[in-house]
């Protein structure tokens, strides 16, 4: 809460750690399409559809002035490109560290980053909150459609783990961008006719204006298609698809959890523990508190960590992170359908029947 641990009151900060991920995004289309095969309530299927969050749009490259560099953004509204008057990147964006020696207000950038590390993702992305951010002095973006220079900001509401970690801002037609532009005195250029942008952003449909070859278009779908055609011809972008669903971070820095059966070898890389050596069991220890370095408690147990590579026989180290609680809760209950089996965890046929038969006892 407010950057403090709710239990002990200590400062809470975020650290970047190497993660093991389950690539569930590979199955995004299948998960989405097969919802039609399920006899579920429509409101539940709607929740699943929104969670998967498939969207169609475009990836657009914004050059960085004077640098052999570009910032790529994903947008569902490429038709509003002529209305882009600034960009926002996540505080964690690698562009900042890459050009730290060119940025003249790095102290302010670092201070803002520190504050962001104290916030949860929910706190950072709330719509109803004061708009905060820092302009990156020393770097400017260029709108690829009109060649105009546009400022680049960092702000907490842009997350590195979502999209490309950067957004193009069209304040005339997005309320959050509008509020940000008002707070920082940034130009607001209307490209869709309607509303009163002196009071608020216009988020409805209408005739395209101030957009050169799109002027006069009234159909949003046609406007988007025409813009995608143009950015592709210019070599600054192409049509794209994105999902809200993210890959599953499948590791935790704690003692109590299923060990991840992988070995890190300096010669062979990451090697799986042989099947015949499974299950890999946790060592019996008295102190299982995590260290201040963020490493798993298992990392401090030399007798567990140090091992031989299953592939080359050389010195190696075990993976010390453990699986999340979902790993155990997703399968332990299957033992109940075959509790007396002393040859396997559960008979595969019975497991199949559990999912395919009206009654597993049949």
Model-derived regions, located:
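Catalytic alpha/beta core of large soluble enzyme barrels
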Residues: 93, 97-196
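Residue-level detector of beta-strand face positions
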Residues: 59-63, 138-142, 262, 306-308
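Residue patterns forming the tRNA-binding/recognition surfaces of aminoacyl-tRNA synthetases
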Residues: 1-71, 78, 166-282, 293-299
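Active-site-adjacent "gating/activation" loops or surface patches in catalytic cores
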Residues: 144-154, 321-354
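Amphipathic alpha-helical
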Residues: 25, 30-53, 95-132, 290-298
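Conserved phosphate/anionic-ligand binding catalytic regions in large, soluble enzymes, centered on
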Residues: 72-92, 322-333, 361
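Acidic, glycine-rich two-metal-ion catalytic cores of nucleic acid-processing enzymes
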Residues: 289-330
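Conserved small/polar residues in nucleotide/adenosyl-binding loops
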Residues: 355-362
């Amino acid at each position: 809460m407010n950057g403090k641990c709710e239990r002990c009151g200590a400062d809470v900060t975020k650290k970047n750690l190497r993660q093991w991920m389950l690539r569930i995004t590979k199955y995004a289309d299948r998960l989405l399409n097969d919802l039609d095969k399920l006899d579920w309530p429509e409101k539940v299927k709607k929740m699943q559809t929104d969670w998967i969050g498939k969207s169609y749009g475009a990836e657009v490259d914004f050059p960085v002035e004077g640098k052999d560099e570009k910032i790529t953004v994903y947008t569902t509204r490429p038709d509003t490109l002529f209305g882009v008057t600034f960009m926002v990147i996540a505080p964690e964006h690698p562009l900042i560290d890459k050009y730290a020696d060119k940025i003249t207000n790095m102290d302010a950038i670092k201070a803002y980053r520190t504050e962001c590390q104290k916030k949860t993702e929910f706190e950072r992305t709330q719509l109803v909150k004061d708009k905060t951010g820092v302009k990156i002095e020393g770097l400017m973006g260029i709108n690829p459609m009109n060649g105009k220079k546009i400022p680049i900001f960092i702000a907490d509401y842009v997350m590195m783990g979502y999209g490309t970690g950067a957004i193009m801002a069209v304040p005339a037609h997005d309320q959050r961008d509008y509020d940000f532009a008002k707070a920082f005195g940034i130009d607001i250029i209307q490209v869709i006719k309607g509303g009163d942008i002196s009071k608020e952003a216009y988020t409805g449909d209408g005739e395209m204006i101030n957009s050169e070859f799109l002027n006069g278009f009234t159909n949003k779908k046609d406007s988007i298609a025409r813009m995608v055609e143009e950015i592709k011809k210019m070599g600054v972008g192409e049509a794209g698809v994105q999902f809200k669903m993210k890959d599953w971070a499948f590791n935790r820095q704690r003692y109590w959890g299923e060990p991840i059966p992988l070995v890190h070898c300096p010669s062979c890389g990451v090697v799986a523990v042989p099947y015949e050596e499974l299950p890999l069991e946790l060592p019996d220890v008295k102190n299982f508190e995590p260290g201040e370095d963020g490493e798993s408690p298992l990392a401090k147990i030399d007798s567990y960590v140090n091992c031989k590579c299953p592939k080359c026989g050389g010195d190696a180290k075990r993976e010390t992170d453990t699986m999340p609680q979902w790993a155990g809760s997703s399968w332990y209950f299957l033992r109940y359908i075959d509790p007396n089996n002393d040859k396997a965890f559960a008979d595969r046929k019975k497991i199949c029947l559990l999912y395919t038969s009206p009654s597993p006892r049949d």
